[in-house]
């Protein structure tokens, strides 16, 4: 009788799937220019970074840059990968053995010792700037007394209160204002 409809549809869909895969494989790749090219390179290369031109090889002295290849011709993933930079070795890369220092290196800690003479010269230089009166013990005491006196002068009260009661024998003092008269 013939082929059932279900099987024929299944075969048709299978054929279309294979045909679309083959067409996609042989069709020319898309072109990338400008910002799209840079974004795609950043996505493909990631942390490695990328170059716009490959190092010149001996075989092909005139190598085209990625802009010339991807913008004017077709560009695919394999071509983009060739422009990715090689990753630099990280500090945690333990695949290579660390360099061994020679054993004859001195093991003494590097310490800058206190130099008394330099300290003494700097204090003498400071003392030369001070007046002779302030360098003596008596002079320093006079300066402290002078500072205490000035501090007391700065904090004196605004109103001097009398020590005695101004009213004689408890008599009340009545002030008459000039407005009432």
Curated annotation (Swiss-Prot):
Using the UniProt annotation, give all residue ranges assigned to the region (B): 25-52
A Pfam family (short name) is: Insulin
> Per the UniProt annotation, where are the glycans attached?
163
* Matches recorded under SMART domains: IlGF
Query: Where does the record place the site Important for interaction with integrin?
Result: 48, 58, 61-62
Post-translational modification comment from the UniProt entry: Proteolytically processed by PCSK4, proIGF2 is cleaved at Arg-128 and Arg-92 to generate big-IGF2 and mature IGF2.
Q: Where is the signal peptide?
A: 1-24
Q: Which residues cross the membrane?
A: none
Which InterPro entries does the entry mention? IGF2, IGF2_C, Insulin-like, Insulin-like_growth_factor, Insulin-like_sf, Insulin_CS, Insulin_family
Q: Where is region (D) located?
A: 86-91
Gene Ontology BP annotations:
embryonic placenta development; embryonic placenta morphogenesis; glucose metabolic process; in utero embryonic development; negative regulation of muscle cell differentiation; negative regulation of transcription by RNA polymerase II; ossification; positive regulation of activated T cell proliferation
Q: Where is this region: C?
A: 53-64
Per UniProt, subunit arrangement is:
Interacts with MYORG; this interaction is required for IGF2 secretion. Interacts with integrins ITGAV:ITGB3 and ITGA6:ITGB4; integrin-binding is required for IGF2 signaling. Interacts with IGFBP2.
Q: Please describe what this protein does.
A: The insulin-like growth factors possess growth-promoting activity. Major fetal growth hormone in mammals. Plays a key role in regulating fetoplacental development. IGF2 is influenced by placental lactogen. Also involved in tissue differentiation. In adults, involved in glucose metabolism in adipose tissue, skeletal muscle and liver. Acts as a ligand for integrin which is required for IGF2 signaling. Positively regulates myogenic transcription factor MYOD1 function by facilitating the recruitment of transcriptional coactivators, thereby controlling muscle terminal differentiation.
Its recorded name reads Insulin-like growth factor 2
Tell me what organism the protein belongs to: Equus caballus
What would be the name of the gene that encodes this protein? Answer: IGF2
């Amino acid at each position: 009788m013939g082929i059932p409809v279900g099987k024929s549809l299944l075969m048709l869909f299978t054929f279309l799937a294979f045909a679309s895969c083959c067409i996609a494989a042989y069709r020319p790749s898309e072109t990338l220019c400008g910002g799209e090219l840079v974004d795609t390179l950043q996505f493909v290369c990631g942390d490695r970074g990328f170059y716009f031109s490959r190092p010149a090889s001996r075989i092909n002295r005139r190598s085209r840059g990625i802009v010339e290849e991807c913008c004017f011709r077709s560009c695919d993933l394999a071509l983009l990968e060739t422009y990715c930079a090689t990753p630099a070795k990280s500090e945690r890369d333990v695949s290579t053995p660390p360099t061994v220092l020679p054993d004859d290196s001195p093991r003494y800690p590097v310490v800058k010792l206190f130099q008394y003479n330099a300290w003494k010269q700097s204090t003498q230089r400071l003392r030369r700037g001070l007046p002779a009166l302030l360098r003596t013990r008596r002079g320093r005491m006079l300066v402290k007394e002078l500072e205490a006196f000035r501090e007391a002068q700065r904090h004196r009260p605004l109103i001097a209160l009398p020590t005695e009661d101004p009213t004689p024998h408890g008599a009340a003092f009545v002030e008459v204002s000039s407005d009432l008269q």
